[in-house]
């Protein structure tokens, strides 16, 4: 029987154990949805896990669906995530950034200029969403136009590139090869 606390090799990546910390939205980002020192400390304290999966990080301003979630679409956010990553690495941990766009699960209070959220279709979700003003009913999103897809894909690629540091490339490429085999 495999011990949960034994190392695990995935291609060229060695995890210190088989514990993976799942994504948890913390709502602790600062002004401009920038990861703060508190975010860095939170993840650093959990560096003993074999791998940390971060809270979901929106790829663009329109991708936010909760207040104070750290994005990966501005230079300040990228710098904030670098501090988080450096803190985890300094504590001997491994960390992977989860990228996302919430689609219709948002509210105009969380969108640039108070615009309606954008989603694949104009279907209003049931329920409520937390905003800085408190709980709000979901609204009907605006359907994404086909012509908008290339720009949205480009934003996702830019977010991936922002998260794809030299260190990440060194670790993720072997991991991707290991997963394929």
Model-found features: residue ranges?
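Alpha-helix-loop-beta-strand connector modules within alpha/beta enzyme cores
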Residues: 69-95
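Non-globular sequence segments
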Residues: 100-162
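Catalytic domains of carbohydrate-active enzymes, especially glycoside hydrolases
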Residues: 38-60, 161-171
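Conserved, mostly hydrophobic/aromatic
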Residues: 21, 46, 88, 97
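Structural preference for beta-strand elements that scaffold enzyme active sites
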Residues: 18-20, 51-53, 94-96, 170-171
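An N-cap/entry alpha-helix motif that binds or orients negatively charged groups
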Residues: 1-11, 19, 23-41
